């Protein structure tokens, strides 16, 4: 038997090796196209962040929410959509239940229209309280609304909240939520009087110290949850090159730490 190594491509001719190479390239392109179709069918992103802004911030996802989303996109390279929770983030803080209902309605809609999109929930300050309600976490002994039905819990890949007032009432979302405890990160700057009980508090610790340290830390946590999630199952068998590993686009960068919020 001839044990000489096979040359896939030579300068003088394109033989079987070249044909195999062309087939391999076409196959890889086809596989990539299939995965792209799964991720972006009907305009659905790879992941989507539903974020509730802090008190007094204009409609949108707020400064902390934007920094969090920017870091998440940078670390994953994924197509990440954004949904700003629609509620009145007033100083009286009477509309958390409205925000929770809006977030829950959107989660249900996404679960129906984009079942392969991994959903991420987030909130800052009063917005964290909105997400507490969605997650079934009461503020003290008081419940302000109905949580997300358990049937939709698997659609949520991760939860990240910042400056959460519930921490002053004796517990964090990550420790109290029956739906999302293990999927959640609840970050409180130790000088933030909104979420921290003790000496050394300054209101600047709530306003100025979550970006970029804590938003980056939260993004790193969420990246791990997104990558740990199940890969969409493709119907039918898809041929795979021997020894090849199918890898989703986007490479996670090392996660730094930092502060800022509202």
Swiss-Prot record:
Disulfide bonds: 44-114, 188-195
EC number, UniProt record: 3.1.1.-
Cross-referenced SMART domains: Cutinase
Region Disordered, residue ranges: 241-262
Signal peptide: 1-41
Active site: 125, 192, 206
Site feature: Transition state stabilizer: 126
InterPro entries (UniProt xref): AB_hydrolase_fold, Cutinase/axe, CUTINASE_1
MF (Gene Ontology): carboxylic ester hydrolase activity
Entry's Gene Ontology cellular component terms: extracellular region
Pfam family, any one: Cutinase
Localisation per UniProt entry: Secreted
First-listed, main subcellular location of the protein, grouped into a coarse class: secreted
Keyword set, alphabetical order: Disulfide bond, Hydrolase, Secreted, Serine esterase, Signal
Similarity comment: Belongs to the cutinase family.
Protein name: Probable carboxylesterase Culp3
The species this protein was found in: Mycobacterium tuberculosis (strain CDC 1551 / Oshkosh)
Gene: cut3
């Amino acid at each position: 038997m001839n044990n000489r190594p096979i040359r896939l491509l030579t300068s003088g001719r394109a033989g079987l090796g070249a044909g195999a190479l062309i087939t391999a390239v076409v196959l890889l392109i086809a596989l990539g196209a299939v995965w792209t179709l799964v991720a972006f069918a009907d305009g659905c992103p790879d992941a989507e962040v539903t974020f509730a802004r802090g008190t007094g911030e204009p409609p949108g996802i707020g400064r902390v929410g934007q920094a969090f989303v920017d870091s998440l996109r940078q670390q994953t390279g994924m197509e990440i959509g954004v949904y700003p929770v629609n509620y009145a983030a007033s100083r009286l803080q009477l509309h958390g239940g409205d925000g929770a209902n809006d977030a829950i309605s959107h989660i249900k809609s996404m679960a129906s229209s984009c079942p392969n999109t991994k959903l991420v929930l987030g909130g800052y300050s009063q917005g964290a309280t909105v997400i507490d309600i969605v997650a079934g976490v009461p503020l003290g002994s008081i419940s302000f609304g109905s949580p997300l039905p358990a049937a939709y819990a698997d659609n949520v890949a991760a939860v990240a909240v910042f400056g959460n007032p519930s921490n002053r009432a004796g517990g964090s979302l990550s420790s109290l939520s029956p739906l999302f405890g293990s999927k959640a990160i609840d970050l409180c700057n130790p000088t933030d009087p909104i979420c921290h009980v003790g000496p050394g508090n300054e209101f600047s610790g709530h306003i100025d110290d979550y970006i970029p340290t804590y938003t980056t830390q939260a993004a790193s946590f969420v990246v791990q949850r997104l990558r740990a999630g199940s890969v969409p199952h493709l119907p039918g068998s898809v041929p795979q090159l021997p020894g090849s590993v199918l890898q989703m686009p986007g490479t996670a960068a090392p996660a730094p730490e930092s502060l800022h919020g509202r």
